[in-house]
Protein backbone atom coordinates (compact mmCIF):
# COMPACT_ATOMS: atom_id res chain seq x y z
CA UNK A 1 0.00 0.00 0.00
CA UNK A 2 1.36 3.42 -0.99
CA UNK A 3 0.15 6.94 -0.24
CA UNK A 4 0.69 10.64 -0.81
CA UNK A 5 -0.36 12.83 2.11
CA UNK A 6 -1.55 16.13 0.67
CA UNK A 7 -1.69 18.07 3.96
CA UNK A 8 1.06 17.83 6.59
CA UNK A 9 2.36 20.32 9.18
CA UNK A 10 5.82 20.03 10.77
CA UNK A 11 6.24 23.39 12.54
CA UNK A 12 3.09 23.87 14.61
CA UNK A 13 5.17 24.00 17.79
CA UNK A 14 7.05 27.14 16.75
CA UNK A 15 4.48 28.74 14.43
CA UNK A 16 2.11 31.48 15.55
CA UNK A 17 -0.80 30.14 17.62
CA UNK A 18 -3.94 32.22 17.17
CA UNK A 19 -6.58 31.75 19.87
CA UNK A 20 -8.93 29.87 17.56
CA UNK A 21 -6.24 27.27 16.86
CA UNK A 22 -5.50 26.76 20.54
CA UNK A 23 -9.18 26.34 21.28
CA UNK A 24 -9.80 23.83 18.50
CA UNK A 25 -6.78 21.78 19.56
CA UNK A 26 -7.96 21.63 23.17
CA UNK A 27 -11.75 21.53 22.82
CA UNK A 28 -12.35 19.85 19.45
CA UNK A 29 -9.47 17.46 18.81
CA UNK A 30 -8.43 17.18 22.49
CA UNK A 31 -4.80 16.61 21.59
CA UNK A 32 -3.05 19.96 22.03
CA UNK A 33 0.19 18.37 23.26
CA UNK A 34 0.49 16.30 20.09
CA UNK A 35 -0.57 19.16 17.81
CA UNK A 36 1.61 21.95 19.17
CA UNK A 37 4.99 20.36 18.64
CA UNK A 38 7.66 20.67 16.02
CA UNK A 39 8.46 17.48 14.16
CA UNK A 40 12.05 16.70 13.22
CA UNK A 41 13.06 15.40 9.82
CA UNK A 42 14.00 11.91 11.02
CA UNK A 43 10.81 11.60 13.07
CA UNK A 44 8.65 12.65 10.13
CA UNK A 45 10.37 10.20 7.81
CA UNK A 46 9.83 7.39 10.33
CA UNK A 47 6.12 8.22 10.55
CA UNK A 48 5.84 8.30 6.76
CA UNK A 49 7.69 5.00 6.35
CA UNK A 50 5.48 3.28 8.93
CA UNK A 51 2.40 4.65 7.16
CA UNK A 52 3.47 3.83 3.61
CA UNK A 53 3.48 7.52 2.66
CA UNK A 54 5.95 8.18 -0.15
CA UNK A 55 5.50 11.97 -0.31
CA UNK A 56 4.15 14.62 2.06
CA UNK A 57 2.98 18.08 1.08
CA UNK A 58 4.13 20.48 3.79
CA UNK A 59 2.34 23.75 4.52
CA UNK A 60 4.03 27.14 4.67
CA UNK A 61 3.11 30.80 4.15
CA UNK A 62 3.85 32.28 0.75
CA UNK A 63 4.95 35.69 2.05
CA UNK A 64 6.99 34.39 5.01
CA UNK A 65 8.18 30.87 4.16
CA UNK A 66 9.48 28.94 7.16
CA UNK A 67 13.14 27.97 6.95
CA UNK A 68 12.33 24.98 9.12
CA UNK A 69 9.80 23.70 6.59
CA UNK A 70 12.09 24.49 3.66
CA UNK A 71 14.88 22.47 5.27
CA UNK A 72 12.80 19.29 4.89
CA UNK A 73 12.55 19.83 1.14
CA UNK A 74 16.24 20.63 0.83
CA UNK A 75 17.24 17.52 2.76
CA UNK A 76 14.81 15.10 1.08
CA UNK A 77 13.38 16.54 -2.14
CA UNK A 78 12.25 13.04 -3.04
CA UNK A 79 9.89 12.92 -0.03
CA UNK A 80 8.71 16.49 0.60
CA UNK A 81 7.11 19.24 -1.47
CA UNK A 82 5.19 22.36 -0.49
CA UNK A 83 1.77 23.97 -0.34
CA UNK A 84 1.75 27.76 0.02
CA UNK A 85 -0.89 29.60 2.04
CA UNK A 86 -1.94 32.85 0.41
CA UNK A 87 -3.77 35.79 2.01
CA UNK A 88 -5.72 37.37 -0.88
CA UNK A 89 -6.37 40.50 1.21
CA UNK A 90 -2.73 41.39 0.58
CA UNK A 91 -3.49 42.11 -3.06
CA UNK A 92 -0.51 42.11 -5.40
CA UNK A 93 1.83 41.35 -2.50
CA UNK A 94 0.12 37.96 -2.27
CA UNK A 95 0.22 37.42 -6.03
CA UNK A 96 3.93 38.21 -6.23
CA UNK A 97 4.71 36.09 -3.17
CA UNK A 98 2.96 33.11 -4.72
CA UNK A 99 4.86 33.59 -7.96
CA UNK A 100 8.14 33.86 -6.05
CA UNK A 101 7.75 30.72 -3.92
CA UNK A 102 6.56 28.76 -6.94
CA UNK A 103 9.71 29.80 -8.80
CA UNK A 104 12.19 29.25 -5.95
CA UNK A 105 10.82 26.21 -4.10
CA UNK A 106 9.03 22.91 -4.89
CA UNK A 107 5.53 24.36 -4.44
CA UNK A 108 2.86 22.11 -5.99
CA UNK A 109 -0.26 23.64 -4.42
CA UNK A 110 -1.63 26.99 -3.26
CA UNK A 111 -4.06 27.30 -0.36
CA UNK A 112 -6.81 29.76 0.63
CA UNK A 113 -8.64 29.36 3.95
CA UNK A 114 -11.89 31.38 3.91
CA UNK A 115 -12.51 31.35 7.66
CA UNK A 116 -9.02 32.74 8.31
CA UNK A 117 -9.54 35.72 6.01
CA UNK A 118 -13.23 36.15 6.93
CA UNK A 119 -14.18 36.32 3.26
CA UNK A 120 -15.83 33.96 0.77
CA UNK A 121 -13.83 32.39 -2.07
CA UNK A 122 -15.78 34.66 -4.42
CA UNK A 123 -14.34 37.85 -2.88
CA UNK A 124 -12.82 40.05 -5.62
CA UNK A 125 -9.40 39.92 -3.96
CA UNK A 126 -9.26 36.16 -4.57
CA UNK A 127 -9.62 36.39 -8.35
CA UNK A 128 -6.04 37.52 -9.08
CA UNK A 129 -4.82 34.51 -7.08
CA UNK A 130 -6.91 32.13 -9.19
CA UNK A 131 -5.67 33.74 -12.39
CA UNK A 132 -2.05 33.47 -11.23
CA UNK A 133 -2.55 29.79 -10.35
CA UNK A 134 -3.75 29.11 -13.89
CA UNK A 135 -0.76 31.00 -15.29
CA UNK A 136 1.61 28.96 -13.07
CA UNK A 137 -0.22 25.66 -13.72
CA UNK A 138 -0.68 25.43 -9.95
CA UNK A 139 -3.70 23.75 -8.30
CA UNK A 140 -5.29 25.54 -5.36
CA UNK A 141 -7.14 24.19 -2.34
CA UNK A 142 -9.95 26.06 -0.59
CA UNK A 143 -11.19 24.93 2.81
CA UNK A 144 -14.82 23.82 2.79
CA UNK A 145 -17.18 22.61 5.50
CA UNK A 146 -17.85 24.02 8.95
CA UNK A 147 -14.43 24.72 10.50
CA UNK A 148 -13.52 23.15 13.80
CA UNK A 149 -12.19 26.44 15.23
CA UNK A 150 -14.73 28.95 16.61
CA UNK A 151 -14.68 31.07 13.46
CA UNK A 152 -17.21 31.98 10.73
CA UNK A 153 -18.26 28.87 8.84
CA UNK A 154 -20.55 30.51 6.31
CA UNK A 155 -17.69 31.36 3.94
CA UNK A 156 -16.82 27.67 3.61
CA UNK A 157 -20.06 26.59 1.99
CA UNK A 158 -19.01 24.68 -1.18
CA UNK A 159 -21.69 26.55 -3.13
CA UNK A 160 -19.30 29.50 -3.41
CA UNK A 161 -17.07 27.32 -5.60
CA UNK A 162 -19.79 26.97 -8.22
CA UNK A 163 -19.01 30.46 -9.46
CA UNK A 164 -15.25 29.93 -9.28
CA UNK A 165 -15.34 26.70 -11.30
CA UNK A 166 -17.59 28.30 -13.88
CA UNK A 167 -15.48 31.44 -14.25
CA UNK A 168 -12.10 29.64 -14.17
CA UNK A 169 -12.56 26.32 -16.02
CA UNK A 170 -8.78 25.88 -16.34
CA UNK A 171 -8.23 26.15 -12.57
CA UNK A 172 -7.59 22.91 -10.68
CA UNK A 173 -9.59 23.50 -7.52
CA UNK A 174 -9.53 21.18 -4.50
CA UNK A 175 -11.92 21.33 -1.56
CA UNK A 176 -9.88 20.79 1.62
CA UNK A 177 -10.89 19.47 5.05
CA UNK A 178 -13.91 17.63 3.65
CA UNK A 179 -17.25 19.39 3.21
CA UNK A 180 -19.27 18.58 6.31
CA UNK A 181 -22.28 19.10 6.50
CA UNK A 182 -22.54 19.84 2.75
CA UNK A 183 -21.35 16.49 1.37
CA UNK A 184 -24.18 16.06 -1.12
CA UNK A 185 -23.62 19.56 -2.48
CA UNK A 186 -19.87 18.99 -2.77
CA UNK A 187 -20.46 15.74 -4.65
CA UNK A 188 -22.95 17.38 -6.98
CA UNK A 189 -20.46 20.14 -7.77
CA UNK A 190 -17.72 17.59 -8.51
CA UNK A 191 -20.06 15.85 -10.91
CA UNK A 192 -20.76 19.19 -12.58
CA UNK A 193 -17.16 20.40 -12.91
CA UNK A 194 -14.22 18.40 -14.24
CA UNK A 195 -11.78 20.76 -12.53
CA UNK A 196 -13.12 20.30 -8.96
CA UNK A 197 -11.73 17.76 -6.47
CA UNK A 198 -11.78 17.10 -2.72
CA UNK A 199 -9.09 16.14 -0.21
CA UNK A 200 -10.03 14.59 3.13
CA UNK A 201 -7.59 16.49 5.36
CA UNK A 202 -8.60 16.83 9.04
CA UNK A 203 -11.46 14.36 8.52
CA UNK A 204 -10.89 10.85 9.86
CA UNK A 205 -11.78 8.16 7.31
CA UNK A 206 -13.81 6.20 9.87
CA UNK A 207 -16.30 9.10 9.84
CA UNK A 208 -16.67 9.39 6.05
CA UNK A 209 -20.41 9.56 5.27
CA UNK A 210 -22.05 6.84 3.21
CA UNK A 211 -22.65 9.19 0.29
CA UNK A 212 -18.92 9.94 0.04
CA UNK A 213 -17.99 6.24 0.07
CA UNK A 214 -20.57 5.60 -2.66
CA UNK A 215 -19.17 8.47 -4.74
CA UNK A 216 -15.62 7.16 -4.31
CA UNK A 217 -16.72 3.73 -5.52
CA UNK A 218 -18.63 5.03 -8.54
CA UNK A 219 -18.41 8.28 -10.49
CA UNK A 220 -15.97 9.92 -8.09
CA UNK A 221 -13.13 7.40 -8.25
CA UNK A 222 -10.79 10.03 -9.71
CA UNK A 223 -11.99 12.94 -7.57
CA UNK A 224 -11.09 12.24 -3.93
CA UNK A 225 -7.54 12.40 -2.57
CA UNK A 226 -6.08 11.43 0.78
CA UNK A 227 -4.74 13.92 3.31
CA UNK A 228 -4.38 13.80 7.09
CA UNK A 229 -3.49 17.31 8.35
CA UNK A 230 -0.89 15.58 10.53
CA UNK A 231 -0.37 16.09 13.47
CA UNK A 232 -3.91 17.45 13.90
CA UNK A 233 -4.96 13.94 12.90
CA UNK A 234 -2.27 11.27 13.00
CA UNK A 235 -1.01 10.23 9.58
CA UNK A 236 -0.76 6.62 10.76
CA UNK A 237 -4.33 6.63 12.02
CA UNK A 238 -5.71 8.10 8.80
CA UNK A 239 -3.89 5.63 6.54
CA UNK A 240 -4.99 2.70 8.72
CA UNK A 241 -8.62 3.83 8.69
CA UNK A 242 -8.49 4.45 4.94
CA UNK A 243 -7.37 0.86 4.39
CA UNK A 244 -10.44 -0.31 6.32
CA UNK A 245 -12.95 1.54 4.12
CA UNK A 246 -15.40 -0.51 2.07
CA UNK A 247 -13.92 0.36 -1.31
CA UNK A 248 -14.00 -1.52 -4.59
CA UNK A 249 -10.86 -3.03 -6.12
CA UNK A 250 -8.45 -0.34 -7.24
CA UNK A 251 -10.26 2.54 -5.53
CA UNK A 252 -8.06 2.60 -2.41
CA UNK A 253 -4.91 3.15 -4.49
CA UNK A 254 -6.62 5.96 -6.38
CA UNK A 255 -7.67 7.59 -3.11
CA UNK A 256 -4.35 7.19 -1.33
CA UNK A 257 -2.00 7.82 -4.23
CA UNK A 258 -3.00 8.03 -7.88
CA UNK A 259 -5.44 10.95 -7.72
CA UNK A 260 -2.97 13.19 -5.91
CA UNK A 261 -0.18 12.09 -8.25
CA UNK A 262 -2.24 12.99 -11.32
CA UNK A 263 -3.54 16.35 -10.07
CA UNK A 264 -0.55 17.62 -8.09
CA UNK A 265 2.40 16.01 -9.88
CA UNK A 266 1.57 16.00 -13.61
CA UNK A 267 4.49 14.71 -15.64
CA UNK A 268 4.31 17.71 -17.97
CA UNK A 269 4.92 20.21 -15.17
Where are these regions (language model features)?
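Conserved, mostly hydrophobic/aromatic
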Residues: 7, 48, 69, 101, ...
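Mid-to-C-terminal alpha-helical segments outside catalytic/metal-binding sites
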Residues: 1-9, 16-51, 55, 221-223, ...
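Active-site environment of divalent metal-dependent phosphoester hydrolases
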Residues: 11-13, 63-65, 89-92, 146-150, ...
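Short, acidic/polar
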Residues: 37-47, 90-102, 183
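Active-site gating/metal-coordination segments in enzymes
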Residues: 54-55, 63-148, 152-155, 192
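Catalytic pocket-lining loop regions of alpha/beta-barrel enzymes
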Residues: 108-109, 122-225
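Histidine-centered catalytic micro-motifs
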Residues: 3-12, 141-144, 175
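A structural motif corresponding to the C-terminal end of an alpha-helix
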Residues: 47-54, 76, 136, 167-171
Amino acid sequence: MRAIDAFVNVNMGSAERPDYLVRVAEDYFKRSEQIFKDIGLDEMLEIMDRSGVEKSILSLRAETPSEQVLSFCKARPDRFVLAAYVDPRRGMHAVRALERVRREYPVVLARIVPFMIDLPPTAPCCYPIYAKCIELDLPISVNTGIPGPPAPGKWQDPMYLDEICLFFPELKLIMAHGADPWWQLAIRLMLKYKNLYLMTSAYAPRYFPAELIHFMNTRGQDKIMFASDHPVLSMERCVKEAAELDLRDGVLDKFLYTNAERVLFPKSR
